[in-house]
């Protein structure tokens, strides 16, 4: 069982890193702590994983719950993303010769940082190219509600990107 679990973690660690960066992008130590807490919670829950949903769906659900629960416990209202980290992340995602794309991604990361926890979670899943059905499985929302929320978040991001802070 342990070997199977470790293989799954190794295969899907990028998923956990995305959640950690979304919720703790301003503090490397807090990201490491959150990563460890998520892996520990995944390990505790692993015996109950029955394969009725994809492993990634199950892992996202647990990872997001751990991150959001920690924020509520610590009463962290928002996560401030440092501009340097956002630009660095954008450069890693962008083609090396695409400075405009890099700046656009940095602006997008900064706008996402201004969203509330639930909105960050939904947009993270959406940007990871998950279907509305998969997002619904992870969040417990209906597929229609996911679509409505994603569209509202897109509108909010558009406003933040073109008109500044809300």
Role assignments for model-derived ranges:
Residues 1-22, 29-32, 43:
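A short, charge-rich alpha-helical start-of-domain segment used by transcription regulators
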Residues 68, 139-164:
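DNA-recognition helix of helix-turn-helix
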Residues 113, 117, 128-145:
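Helix-turn-helix DNA-binding module
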């Amino acid at each position: 069982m342990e070997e199977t679990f470790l293989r799954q973690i190794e295969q899907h660690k990028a998923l956990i890193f995305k959640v950690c960066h979304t919720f703790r992008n301003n503090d490397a130590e807090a990201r490491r702590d959150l990563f460890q807490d998520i892996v520990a919670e995944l390990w505790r829950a692993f015996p109950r994983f029955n394969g009725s949903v994809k492993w990634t769906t199950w892992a996202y659900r647990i990872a997001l719950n751990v991150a959001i629960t920690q924020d509520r416990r610590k009463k962290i209202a928002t996560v401030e993303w440092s501009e340097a980290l956002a630009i660095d992340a954008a450069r890693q995602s962008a083609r090396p010769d695409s400075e405009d794309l890099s700046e656009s991604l940095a602006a997008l990361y900064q706008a996402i940082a201004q969203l509330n926890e639930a909105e960050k979670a939904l947009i993270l899943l959406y940007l990871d190219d998950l279907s509305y059905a998969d997002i619904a499985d992870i969040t417990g929302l209906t597929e229609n509600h996911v679509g409505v929320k994603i569209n509202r978040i897109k509108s909010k991001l558009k406003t933040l990107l073109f008109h500044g802070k809300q």
